[in-house]
């Protein structure tokens, strides 16, 4: 190691920043976050520094730096574009044994400022020892995207119970095991969901041994349309900590690769007239697994509340007193249209959009066809590949133009995506003559014409215009 990573307590202690520009402002903000008493010395200041002065957050001295300014300081940062001045500040600080940092000059520093992931009281510092600051910032960004902001609240909760845990467990191993269970379990998830008081009560009950049988939890997670990059941070976190994953046919293989490696996987996918597990059995299985104390991820393609029967599943959970949370996902209509270069609404072509299922409860398609056939709107059909002849006929009967543009998006947002462009009249012929597989989304409306201009993701569409 070129540097020893340490954390310095500057709370209510005098810190000096030389310079009043935008870089100085960023450093001042860091010092203020650590409750340092900041003095800024510069001939002029930027608007943000001036605002701090007006709000009495810092002391500002409008003049050139003088040698005596280092007296009494516990930490100094020089953030000017004057190399001679920066060197002078560094030398004076070093002579007085005061830690000093000079921006973009590692050779003049006795300490360097890392990139910081702040989940106070949890702090993560990333440094490249001054070799590649941009790389350190990229690493920081990756960490920012994976660590919930509520980790700080979890640490504070643990701190409040630290003495009780020390009193209860004499062996270090027992303490460690207890905290590992807390930090990776349901109590932590309650903190992440903002249920601090519930988490506090559960932790206290666990310490008091009043929890007879720890009930698990169910995470109803939207897996998006296929591209794993479209998962939310929360979805990914819950997928990676679940003990059991119940997944659908529409969840892509690349999304499934991100679930916890040692989790039990249970396939409960459905196809037309072929349900691997009936919906009622799925609902009960979620209850049974949670009652065993397991963390269950119910992973669905798209969004669980848009034609995903998620509402039915959590109704059963609520009736049985099972804790659950729902994580929205990017629905297929949004993902597939975006990756096809087809905006669902457009000022010139469509002022509204309707999502319609082509697979109704009783097997019929008893839809408000006269409403669907009006102009200036986009219709998106889910699960309608086997019903294209009927839906095409009904829309034409209800006065939608036979030449209305139609797009079929097969396996949208994935590397296997295919987009077929046709018209409402020719839609049945296209499906009959081409080998098109589910999942396929059908988009109907003038906005489909924009694909030729706005397509960004895949190759040219397969067309069947006649």
UniProtKB/Swiss-Prot annotation:
UniProt modified residues of type Phosphoserine: 128
Listed pathway(s): Cofactor biosynthesis; adenosylcobalamin biosynthesis; precorrin-2 from uroporphyrinogen III: step 1/1; Cofactor biosynthesis; adenosylcobalamin biosynthesis; sirohydrochlorin from precorrin-2: step 1/1; Porphyrin-containing compound metabolism; siroheme biosynthesis; precorrin-2 from uroporphyrinogen III: step 1/1; Porphyrin-containing compound metabolism; siroheme biosynthesis; siroheme from sirohydrochlorin: step 1/1
Keyword S-adenosyl-L-methionine recorded: yes
Pfam families attached to this UniProt entry: CysG_dimeriser (PF10414), NAD_binding_7 (PF13241), Sirohm_synth_M (PF14824), TP_methylase (PF00590)
Start and end residues of each stretch annotated as Uroporphyrinogen-III C-methyltransferase: 216-466
Precorrin-2 dehydrogenase /sirohydrochlorin ferrochelatase: annotated span: 1-203
Methyltransferase found in the keyword field: yes
Active site annotation, chain numbering: 248 (proton acceptor), 270 (proton donor)
Any one GO molecular function term: uroporphyrin-III C-methyltransferase activity
HAMAP family (alphabetical): Siroheme_synth
NCBIfam families found in the cross-reference section: cobA_cysG_Cterm (TIGR01469), cysG_Nterm (TIGR01470), PRK06136.1 (NF004790), PRK10637.1 (NF007922)
Name assigned to this protein: Siroheme synthase
Name of the gene: cysG
């Amino acid at each position: 190691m070129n540097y020893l990573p340490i954390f310095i307590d500057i709370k209510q202690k005098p810190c000096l920043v030389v310079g009043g520009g935008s870089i100085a402002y960023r450093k001042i903000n860091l010092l203020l976050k650590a409750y340092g008493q900041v003095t800024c010395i510069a001939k002029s200041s930027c608007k943000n520094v001036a605002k701090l002065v007006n709000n009495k957050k810092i002391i500002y001295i409008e003049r050139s730096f003088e040698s005596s300014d280092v007296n009494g300081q516990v930490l100094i940062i020089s953030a000017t574009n004057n190399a001679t001045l920066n060197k002078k500040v560094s030398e004076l600080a070093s002579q007085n044994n005061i830690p000093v940092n000079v921006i973009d000059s590692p050779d003049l520093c006795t300490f360097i400022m890392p990139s910081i992931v702040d989940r106070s009281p949890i702090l993560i510092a990333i440094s490249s020892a001054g070799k590649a600051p941009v790389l350190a910032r990229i690493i920081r960004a990756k960490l920012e995207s994976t660590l919930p902001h509520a980790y700080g609240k979890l640490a504070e909760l643990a701190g409040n119970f630290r003495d009780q845990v020390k009193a209860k467990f004499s062996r270090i191993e027992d303490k460690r095991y207890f905290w590992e269970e807390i930090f990776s379990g349901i109590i932590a998830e309650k903190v992440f969901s903002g249920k601090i008081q519930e988490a506090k009560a559960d932790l206290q009950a666990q310490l008091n041994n009043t929890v007879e049988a720890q009930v698990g939890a169910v995470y109803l997670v939207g897996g998006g349309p296929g591209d794993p990059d479209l998962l939310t941070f929360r979805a990914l976190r819950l997928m990676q900590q679940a003990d059991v994953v119940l997944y659908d046919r529409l969840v892509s293989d690349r999304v499934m690769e991100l679930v916890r490696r040692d989790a039990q996987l249970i396939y409960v996918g459905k196809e037309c007239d072929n349900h691997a597990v009936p919906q009622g059995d799925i609902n009960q299985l979620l209850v049974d697994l949670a009652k065993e104390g397991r963390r269950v991820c119910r992973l669905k393609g798209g969004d669980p509340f848009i034609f995903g029967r998620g509402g039915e599943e959590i109704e059963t959970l609520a009736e049985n007193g099972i804790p659950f949370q729902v994580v929205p996902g990017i629905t297929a209509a949004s993902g597939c249209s975006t990756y096809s270069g087809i905006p669902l609404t457009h000022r010139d072509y469509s002022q509204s959009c309707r999502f319609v299922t082509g697979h109704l409860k009783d097997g019929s398609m008893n839809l408000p066809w006269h409403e669907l056939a009006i102009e200036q709107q986009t219709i998106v059909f889910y699960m309608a590949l086997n019903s294209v002849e009927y839906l095409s006929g009904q829309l034409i009967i209800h006065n939608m133009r036979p030449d209305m543009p139609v797009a079929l998006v097969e396996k949208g947002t994935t590397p296997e995506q295919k987009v077929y462009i046709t018209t409402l009249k020719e839609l049945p012929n296209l499906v009959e003559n081409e080998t098109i597989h589910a999942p396929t989304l059908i988009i109907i409306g003038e906005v489909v014409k924009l694909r030729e201009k706005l397509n960004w993701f895949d190759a040219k569409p397969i067309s069947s215009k006649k």
